[in-house]
């Protein structure tokens, strides 16, 4: 779950209190089905502010597996010791030091625990995953389940690329123009310039929701005439709405991978193939 400061910054920037972190956290609770805090732990459920009735199952790895692997147990122990040491030296107040350590332990190193989110505590934590009974359970699986239950209400088209959003004279979206065929996107290594695809249109009675990712969402808006006028005119696109911010200020958090060579092998993952099993083959 993001830092509260991320949501609060957007709320301030847009002058829209609905983006405030306390309000946005309600949506997280609506979609989450936390499976690693049992029902009988009433106070843990209450203080963590997780969601327990949503469609997205969340779980954490079984810590008892550490008992099977002394090397992995040693690594986790060293990481925890370093995390505690860092927190101890960066927090001047000794009472706050102890409080932070206790808070980490009481929250089971859960990065989605509300108290940790609110204080933005750094250091060692568990990694929540969207897995249910050993199988991946994300947006894809949810959509497939809904399509199976309500085939008349949800249609999913594969190999389909939206070209632009259709806007009326009042710049209200009333549909999309799209084409069907594989490898249409030019960034696809299998894309061929010679291929042609028939354009089709789909119309809506309510609204068009654009959810195409950090890069394709602004691209689709600009192809539809929504974006900085100078750039749209450069590509001979009629400007419907002049919004200079579209396609700008794309940011992400830094991720730095660290590769280390261990003196000892990790027994727990010995023999793992790290790939889907073949037909008749047992999974890792």
Question: Where are the model-predicted features located?
Answer:
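Structural core of flavin- and non-heme-iron oxidoreductases
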Residues: 1-284
